[in-house]
């Protein structure tokens, strides 16, 4: 009887010596934070990581910004930029929504960490913010973990709303994922959407490009790629042979009626193909503000 061959784990990516030296220099400039919470789901492919900075100083940022995280890995110190998923109002906790990339330079090490582990980070950066968008109606489009900056923004508005500060925004969020067990933060976002009767103007639409009941798909989740769902909502064509199916009780027209082009900004984060594909229909709608954010290194 012979044993079945065991799969060979992906080889760690080669590191350029100059890059490695630069990374070590950067490491010395980075502050430290402790991992206080780790929640992994979707078969271990997605995770929410919460860090608490070791400094006693208040770590302030604008919702929608990103920071650089770094860890020592088998090939040396590796830094990568990640959008912050937590709200600046989250009591000093920095939260991240991260996808595991097999064979990636950093994410396998991130997912191997447990509470108590030390991460390094830099000060926040970026202009992917509500202030930059500068419009009352915000159409947010995300694929996968590109949802992170939108969670930060929507959660911040909700916390202010709960504190008696009414939101000046109407937000429409489209979140696309391949499978329905990959919708991070769904329960939280559905709770906000249910609060429309309380004056919180938020619409949330999930869409699965590979709808499979065994992976959590239910009719309340739209079918189709998120960029094609947005195209359908905007009354623009999608490629021949492709299809979009809206959830029961939701029509493209009912969502389109919420969008006033003159006072609307689109914001997209995630797959570069999705971001590129939306340029034409957004321009056709007459919307001039289109903010994008892309991070694809692993």
Identify what each model region corresponds to.
Residues 67, 119-122:
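Generic structural signal for buried aliphatic residues
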Residues 84, 151-162:
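Histidine-anchored nucleotide/phosphate-binding helix
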Residues 2-9, 13, 20, 26-31, ...:
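Reductase modules of NAD(P)H-dependent flavoproteins
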Residues 143-149:
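Ser/Thr-glycine-rich phosphate-binding loops at phosphate-binding pockets of nucleotides
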Residues 140-143, 268-269:
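Active-site-adjacent beta-strand anchor residues
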Residues 15-115:
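Ferredoxin-reductase
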């Amino acid at each position: 009887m012979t044993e079945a061959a065991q799969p060979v784990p992906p080889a760690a990516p080669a590191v350029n010596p100059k890059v490695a030296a630069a990374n070590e220099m950067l490491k010395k400039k980075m502050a430290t934070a402790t991992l206080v919470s780790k929640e992994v789901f979707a078969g271990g492919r997605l995770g929410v990581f919460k860090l608490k900075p070791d400094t006693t100083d208040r770590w302030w940022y604008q919702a929608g910004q990103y920071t650089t995280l770094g860890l020592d890995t088998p090939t040396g110190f590796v830094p990568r930029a990640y959008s912050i998923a937590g709200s600046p109002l989250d009591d000093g906790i920095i939260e991240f929504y991260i996808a595991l990339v097999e064979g990636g330079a950093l994410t396998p090490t991130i997912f191997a960490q447990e509470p108590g582990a030390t991460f390094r980070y830099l000060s926040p950066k970026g202009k992917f913010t509500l202030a930059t968008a500068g419009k009352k109606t915000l159409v947010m489009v995300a694929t996968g973990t590109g949802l992170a900056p939108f969670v930060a923004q929507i959660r911040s508005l909700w916390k202010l709303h709960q504190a008696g500060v009414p939101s000046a925004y109407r937000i429409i969020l489209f979140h696309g994922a391949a499978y329905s067990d990959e919708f991070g933060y769904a329960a939280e976002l559905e709770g906000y959407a249910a609060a429309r009767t309380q004056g919180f103007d938020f619409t949330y639409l999930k869409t699965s490009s590979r709808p499979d009941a065994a992976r959590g798909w239910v009719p309340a989740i739209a079918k189709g790629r998120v960029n094609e769902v947005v195209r359908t909502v905007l009354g623009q064509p999608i490629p021949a042979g492709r299809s979009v199916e809206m959830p029961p009780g939701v029509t493209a027209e009912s969502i389109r009626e919420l969008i006033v082009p003159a006072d609307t900004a689109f914001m997209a984060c995630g797959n570069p193909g999705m971001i590129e594909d939306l340029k034409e229909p957004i321009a056709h709608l007459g919307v001039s503000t289109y903010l994008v954010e892309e991070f694809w290194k692993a």
